[in-house]
UniProtKB/Swiss-Prot annotation:
PANTHER family: GTPASE DER
Gene that encodes the chain: der
Subunit record text: Associates with the 50S ribosomal subunit.
NCBIfam families listed in its UniProt record: GTPase_EngA, small_GTP
Domain (KH-like) ranges: 358-443
Annotated GTP 2 binding sites: 186-193, 233-237, 298-301
Molecular function terms, GO-annotated: GTP binding
Name of the protein in question: GTPase Der
Record domain EngA-type G: where: 4-165, 180-357
Binding site for GTP 1: 10-17, 57-61, 119-122
Function (record text): GTPase that plays an essential role in the late steps of ribosome biogenesis.
Recorded family membership: Belongs to the TRAFAC class TrmE-Era-EngA-EngB-Septin-like GTPase superfamily. EngA (Der) GTPase family.
Recorded superkingdom: Bacteria
Coiled-coil residue spans: none
Length: 447
């Protein structure tokens, strides 16, 4: 028996994301005074009292007939259809607005169990009987920010969705356990959301020609070739110097934080926008965090056939020149909107993930080390003594990290370390991931 689904619905800035965070067991939504922050359906495991459920945060609904408004309405409508219970939220400070009446009627026409949640009621006298005119048979007053009124909300929820029918205590949580966490990152308007929608074959994420549509990191559970995958769409990352709005700073921070906890990062690049320093900055950040990386050039269908060969030649040159620390990184050319080569991206992610987790036997490591250092020894130091790397062992995976023992580690140059790392990539088939070396001084300096 699966968990019941509760959707939070209402006009912008009534506190849906604040309540989402209050009820969420794990992932948090961005909260800001600016209305309309949420633009995609956002899911989390929720809990109130002993009652556990799947919670959906939705875009704020407005009477808006432009293209963006229609796409936001589509996202919310899908959440309503998916939900077992609707929490229709209004603002207790501003009172009932015309949009509340219109949207209340819109929600009620689906004949789903619903609760009118009057938020921002920090004081008892905030309650207004006018709210009954919205036509909902159940109503509670709460303050999502301060956590008041949640007991009343709990009582109404279990009345609408009896607890014994909603929870299976022995059921495995699909979020927990072994899964591959893939973050899709890149500059604005590279096609990140379109790519994920194409993969899962669902208009799950809001897309459009406007740059910067995605404002929060959105997690989507998915399965591919018997692998449990969590896809994470992130806000587009611009240069720090161009970010002035506080909301964009929050979105950028959310995206950067997602990279920190990723297993593999897909760096999405727009084929119509030449490779920029910001793309390389994002890639370097991924590598510095020790994550696996797959570089994807999107909108390949829009590049003229006569220019593709020269484009690829220059692109590979730039990547190899500026990202030598992940030599051999997979580069794929796709069209997300046409679903061209998109499965190859996932196959590359699975391969990179396997390499990222690679464990090499100590005996094989030292056999390789002896051969490699003898083939290209470090130069003699003053007094005729040679710096030697005598022994190594792997200390961790994710990414592969190695400890090397030397009689004089401070004399080992960066260029020699690059030589060892690149040789190791070839010897053990480890392209496209960061490899980390740390040096330790042996107790006997003459060894």
């Amino acid at each position: 028996m699966t968990k019941k689904i509760i959707a939070l619905v209402g006009r912008p800035n009534v506190g849906k994301s604040t309540l989402f965070n209050r009820l969420s067991i794990r992932k948090k939504a961005i909260v800001h005074d600016l209305p309309g922050i949420t633009r995609d359906r956002k899911y989390t495991d929720g809990k109130i009292g002993s009652f556990e459920f799947l919670l959906i945060d939705t875009p704020g609904l407005e009477e808006n007939h432009d293209s963006m408004g229609a796409r936001l309405m589509e996202q919310t409508t899908k959440a309503i259809l998916e939900a077992d219970l609707i929490c229709f939220m209004v603002d207790g400070r501003s009172g009932i607005l015309p949009n509340d009446k219109l949207l209340g009627s819109f929600v009620r026409k689906y004949n789903k169990p619903a609760i009118l949640v009057v938020n921002k009621c920090e004081k008892a006298f905030d309650f207004d009987k006018e709210y009954y005119k919205l036509g909902f048979d159940s109503m509670v007053t709460i303050s999502a920010e301060h956590g008041t009124g949640l007991i009343d909300l709990y009582d109404e929820i279990i009345t609408k969705l009896p607890e014994e029918e909603s929870i299976e205590t022995n059921i495995a949580d699909p979020i927990k356990g072994d899964y591959l966490q893939i973050v899709v990152s890149g500059r604005p308007n590279a096609g990140k959301s379109t790519f994920i929608n194409a993969l899962i074959n669902d208009e799950r994420l809001l897309t459009g020609p406007e740059a910067g549509i995605t404002r929060e990191s959105i997690e989507i559970d998915w399965h591919y070739k018997n692998n449990h995958i969590k896809l994470i769409d992130t806000a587009g990352l611009r240069k720090k110097s161009t970010i002035t709005e506080s909301l964009e700073k929050l979105s950028a921070s959310d995206a950067i934080n997602s990279i920190k906890f990723a297993n593999t990062v897909i760096l999405m690049i727009d084929a119509l926008a030449p490779l920029k320093q910001q793309d390389l900055n994002i890639a370097s950040h991924v590598v510095n965090e020790g994550r696996g990386i797959v570089i994807v050039v999107n909108k390949w269908d829009l590049v003229k056939e006569s220019k593709k060969e020269a484009f690829q030649e220059e692109f590979y040159y730039q990547i190899n020149t500026h990202l030598p620390q992940v030599k051999g990184v997979p580069v794929l050319f796709i069209s997300a909107i046409n679903k061209q080569n998109i499965e190859q991206v996932l196959d590359s992610c699975l391969k990179i993930y396997k390499i990222w987790n690679k464990k090499i036997a100590t005996s094989k490591l030292n056999e390789w080390l002896n051969f490699t250092t003898e083939a290209h020894p470090l130069p003699l130091q003053k007094g005729g003594r040679r710096v030697r790397v005598k022994y190594m062992t792997q200390t961790k995976t994710r990414p592969p990290t190695f400890k090397l023992f030397s009689n004089n580690p401070e004399k080992i140059t960066d260029s020699y370390t690059r030589y060892l790392v690149n040789n190791m990539r070839d010897a053990f088939d480890m392209p496209g991931i960061p490899i980390r070396f740390t040096y330790v001084k042996t107790k006997n300096p003459y060894v």
